[in-house]
């Protein structure tokens, strides 16, 4: 005989006499409580100052900030999804106090109320809280960068080289047409050539030619059509070329639909053909896997972002960290000089750091780095024992305006040298070498720091600091592409990502502490 099956009580329409509050449905150690507690401690007066009095009441900015930050913690980046969760999710209902702003209100708050440095100030306050809690010390920065795609389409590119080439061709064509017209006018009336407009004002020059042609009754239809084409087509095109170059500024490219995005080569290259995509170079500094600073830059290379990034750290916290750890993408003379002048210990690799440890490199006597150098008399000695005296200096200026000095050394005579084939392959009779002594001294000091006990410890931590943070953000939380346009809004968006990352880690720490206390009470 089968036993009777018993089910637990189930009645959807059974109302409680005293309904539970939403807070009772949320665990004590849930991350949403951490978000609420941290944001309640923030000074949001800068955001409140953007609201105007009178009119309809507004949703509270602290509530909207909590909803957006918690959404980014939960991998929710869309305003429409946030709106839906405010109707469906208990955590969102509790966090918002049952307020239900629509997606337009959420998006407007995110892109307009948090801009102009207001969100950066909130991020600074949270990092200061972490510092007071002992989670970060702000004495060391592990710096790294990654490229994140813009929301713009990859086929919206505008290239500086193409614009400059087409602009020069069109200017030459316009000039030829106008000169041909002016020569005809000069034959009819020599006085008109005396007041020829300058090339700087093509529009006035074209109008003047057409006016003179009407006054003198020039019947050359082909020439007139050419001048009218210059006025109607060529001049507007030159104006558009000028605007493209103004938007581009120092960059080599930009996107038509996100004017601040620059085309860069991304690591995520599905076609494996090196195709460039519009994006931003995102730089972060971490400590104990907490993001302490972030920046958005248009330069694709990391070395050009380091100095402004370190400046932003000092401006944000009023102090500078004593140690900086970074990979070889940041190791150049300008960055080393900046860190030395600001009292920063640079645990920063340079491009040949690992190659110098190889036996093949150390045994190659033809390399400048392995030649004997007499510092007092300023000469090098080649593998055949011949002196290479200094014969001059060369100067170069980087894209950022940093001036470098290189000394040139040249051998006295290399004719008949049995080692010439291995030494150099140039057709000139004597080998010359170029040495940047200042850069070499920076590299020597960097190697001493990196190979010290402290340096070995910091180097071993670097792969699990910013690189692990980027991996967590991109692959665990799916943030591989910005959803807002312009540098101004992209800074807000990545700032939200950074704050969400920090609060996730901080919430995990608090949860472990709470579990530890509960375990201690249970064992008493």
Language model regions located:
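Short secondary-structure transition/capping motifs
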Residues: 24, 56-60, 71, 75, ...
